[in-house]
């Protein structure tokens, strides 16, 4: 069975945590919109599905995954569905729920990242809200990044007698998502994250260990990994990254 992932073909965005899980597990999947050469046609392919009233469990927005006749939307729910199939979560119910809790926190964090460059409205261009973005980013860097990273670091400390991972004794999809967070912060806020990393050694250890996994390393060095750019969740703007 080949999974079909629907997400915007030009960004990592919220769909990247799903791609990382599929790549790590070496699953057969089709990144559907990326197989369409024309960007406008790729967007149309997704929007036509979203506008289709055909009785399926209709997603509100991408990412969504199709597995046979099953349609699942929202990155955290997609991962909750996939993880047992891909051996990316424990078979213990309490650990599965905790992993899902962590992933929902990741979702919250990604929204806060997005709001640094779109603090007023998604319908406005970044250039239309630069001054508000500067204000939002100052608070995000000084308060929100440390708060989230401390949370992840604390989870890792609490689990240190069992493993170096976030949940239980094995790598889970939450660790892959934490990797994506650090990669994104290094791209979008390199000066800020450089000052913070030494305070969260276990978080950085997770990032480093995942980077060295052959399947992940191969993915990162392939054309399947979309580069960070100015259209995704993590965006680099010099005026938001002042020393």
Question: At which residue positions do the language-model features occur?
Answer:
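C-terminal helix/juxtamembrane-tail motif
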Residues: 2, 216-243
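Short, contiguous strand/loop micro-motifs
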Residues: 4-6, 193-194, 218
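Short amphipathic alpha-helices and their capping/turn residues within compact interaction modules
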Residues: 26-27, 83, 87, 150, ...
């Amino acid at each position: 069975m080949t999974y079909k992932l629907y997400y915007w073909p030009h960004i990592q965005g919220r769909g990247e945590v799903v791609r990382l899980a599929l790549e790590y597990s070496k699953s057969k999947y089709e990144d559907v919109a990326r197989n369409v050469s024309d960007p406008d046609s790729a967007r149309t392919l997704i929007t036509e599905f979203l506008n289709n009233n055909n009785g399926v469990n209709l997603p509100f927005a991408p990412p969504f995954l199709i597995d046979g006749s099953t349609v699942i939307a929202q990155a955290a729910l997609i991962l909750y569905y996939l993880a047992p199939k891909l051996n990316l979560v424990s078979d213990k119910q309490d650990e599965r729920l905790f992993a899902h809790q962590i992933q929902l926190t990741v979702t919250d964090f990604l929204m806060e990242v997005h709001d640094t460059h779109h603090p007023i409205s998604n319908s406005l261009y970044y250039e239309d809200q630069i001054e508000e973005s500067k204000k939002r980013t100052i608070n995000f860097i000084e308060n929100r990044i440390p708060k989230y990273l401390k949370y992840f670091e604390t989870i890792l400390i609490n689990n240190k007698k069992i493993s170096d991972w976030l949940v239980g004794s094995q790598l889970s999809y939450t660790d892959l998502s934490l990797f994506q967070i650090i990669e994104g912060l290094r791209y979008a806020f390199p000066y800020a994250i450089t000052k913070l990393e030494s305070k969260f050694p276990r978080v950085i250890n997770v990032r480093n260990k995942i980077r060295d996994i052959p399947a992940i390393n191969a993915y990162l060095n392939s054309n399947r990994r979309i580069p960070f750019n100015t259209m995704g969740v993590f965006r680099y703007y010099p005026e938001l990254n002042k020393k």
